[in-house]
Amino acid sequence: MLDVAEMFVSINGEGTLAGQLAVFVRFSGCNLCCSYCDTMWANQSDTPCRTMTAEEIYNEICKMGIRNVTLTGGEPLNRNDIFELMELLAKDSRLYVEIETNGSIPLKPFLSIKNRPSMTMDYKLPSSGMEHSMYTENLNLLDSRDTVKFVSGSIGDLERAKEIINEYKLIDRCEVYLSPVFGKIEPSTIVEYMKQNQMNGVTLQLQMHKIIWNPNAKGV
């Protein structure tokens, strides 16, 4: 069984499909506690949830008629029945499935799924307070279907992101995004850093949904 905090249709606010419609399935609970977390409400023990089977979630997704599906959280890979749901979704050729994961869960077991979802993996930078939890071996397993996202709140974070990008040769491996911690660093500061360091192949990403709606809004 899986605890679903919310399920809704909106636009993808970030990533390679930014601006496209997607079904979002947000699971409750996370094994990390990042300083800038914008979905802390979904990680509380008393968060109202729907407890659903993998098949129930799949059927509800199908009824919505939207091709893109994003599994998010919380931390979706830290759920007992998530493998079953991933297999159900992967068998449906009508769907394009993306999983947002926090970088602390080993990805290898999930990468064996035939027609597996794409992985958007956070690498938690120093200002998150969670860099010590990163499972760095994941960075060697990603391919062109996948993305690594660095959410940066300071120049120090950007320096660390550059180190990781270079150490693991991420530009040659997968998509790479730099994103500002909302309200902590100006996007223009990130652009200047990218220019000064000739960060070819890196994409600046802004959270589109926070521009369109209230940054604290749920279900958007």
What are these regions (language model features)?
Residues 24, 70, 147-149:
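Short aromatic/hydrophobic contact patches that present stacked aromatics
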Residues 2, 9, 21-22, 33-117:
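Conserved Radical SAM active-site core
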Residues 5, 11, 46, 133-136:
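A generic, residue-level signal for flexible/boundary positions that often mark functional hotspots
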Residues 77-220:
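Conserved AdoMet/S-adenosylmethionine-binding subsite of the radical SAM
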Residues 1-28, 32-36, 40-41, 197-203, ...:
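Flexible, acidic/Gly-rich N-terminal and inter-domain linker regions that tether
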Residues 28-31, 57-58, 133-134, 163:
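Short hydrophobic/aromatic-rich motifs at helix boundaries and adjacent loops
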Residues 21, 28, 48, 149-152, ...:
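Short N-terminal micro-motifs specific to bacterial/archaeal maturation
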